């Protein structure tokens, strides 16, 4: 199942794909501590300034080369990272379930 989150302030549309639980201990984690796959689409990244885009690229342990960018982090860490990368603070405004074949 996938979740589409909309960051209203920056009009960035990102897709969170729930990852399968790798270890039984993860089952006991709170929902917002689960690991998600974040995909930032090309058209959204182009709205960022070059300096912010470089800052995003500096997270080499998080980001593979090319598009779409992928981050593997618990949801609160993702929100903090996006707040650092984007202009000003980032607020994840809406979350809705969408059909997914994953």
From Swiss-Prot:
Keywords: Host cytoplasm, Host nucleus, Secreted, Signal, Virulence
One GO cellular component term: host cell nucleus
Origin: domain of life: Eukaryota
Principal subcellular localization: secreted
Compartments, as annotated in UniProt: Secreted; Host chloroplast envelope; Host cytoplasm; Host nucleus
Keyword Signal (UniProt): yes
Induction: Expression is up-regulated at the earlier infection stages.
Signal peptide limits: 1-22
Motif (RxLR-dEER): 51-60
Protein family according to the UniProt entry: Belongs to the RxLR effector family.
Domain free text: The RxLR-dEER motif acts to carry the protein into the host cell cytoplasm through binding to cell surface phosphatidylinositol-3-phosphate.
Function (record text): Effector that partially suppresses the tobacco programmed cell death induced by cell death-inducing proteins.
Name of protein: Secreted RxLR effector protein 61
